[in-house]
Regions:
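Iron-sulfur cluster-binding electron-transfer modules in prokaryotic oxidoreductases
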Residues: 1-203
Length: 204
């Protein structure tokens, strides 16, 4: 059994991603639940220096997922906040630190959960397209989830997976970074788009 942490972006902009995650997990025999009390993980306010507000949101998440066996997150950024930075937020509060460490141990990014916990690399799907893969920065650098998405993609039948030049370079989004430094963000995105287009892939 696993609990889905839906993330703000999935909830507000891409709900179909959440639906797809649930479908994939259920096809693998996972009983998925969706704790109703969940809210933002607190990363945007934490990255903006508002640690007090971040703690309030984090405490809500700790309480909401306290009984979950696994917490599956379709976002490297949110998963990193919960796994890496919640213990840092509560390092001076022994009781909450223990709760943060307990949650940290059961938080998994989606592809990581499939490969590491379920032991699944072949989902039994096919797609006769060409694709290239961009690894998200938080997923790559903070969670160290590097190979799991590629293992899954390489098992997609008929899919031609093309290498992305400078794949590990940031796309320029970085959450609040793109708002605080829009011109730098646009430049980084421009470089990323050029590299993606150079592959000739149908899908990113």
């Amino acid at each position: 059994k696993a609990s889905l942490f839906v993330t703000c972006i999935v909830d507000q902009l891409y709900p179909e991603v959440g639906v797809s995650v649930v479908r994939v997990l259920r096809r693998q025999g996972v009983d998925v639940d969706f704790p109703q009390g969940q809210t933002c993980c607190g990363q945007p306010v934490y990255n903006s220096g508002f640690t007090g507000q971040a703690r309030l949101l984090a405490r809500r998440v700790l309480s909401t997922f306290a009984e979950s066996r696994y917490v599956v997150v379709p976002s490297g950024s949110c998963a990193a906040m919960m796994r890496v930075f919640y213990p840092e937020l509560f390092k001076d509060d022994p009781a909450l630190l223990r709760q943060a460490q307990e949650l940290s141990a059961k938080v998994y990014e989606f592809s990581e959960f499939l490969v590491k916990v379920l032991g699944v690399e072949d989902l039994g799907v096919s797609n006769p397209d060409t694709a290239t893969y961009h690894p998200g920065c938080h997923q790559l650098r903070e969670l160290e989830v590097r190979d799991e998405p590629l293992k899954l993609l390489r098992q997609v039948g008929s899919l031609e997976l093309r290498d992305l030049p400078h794949a590990e370079s940031c796309c320029g989004f970085g959450g609040a970074f793109s708002v605080k430094f829009p011109h730098i963000s646009e430049g980084m995105l421009s470089d990323k788009v050029k590299n993606v287009m150079s592959t000739g892939a149908d899908t990113l």
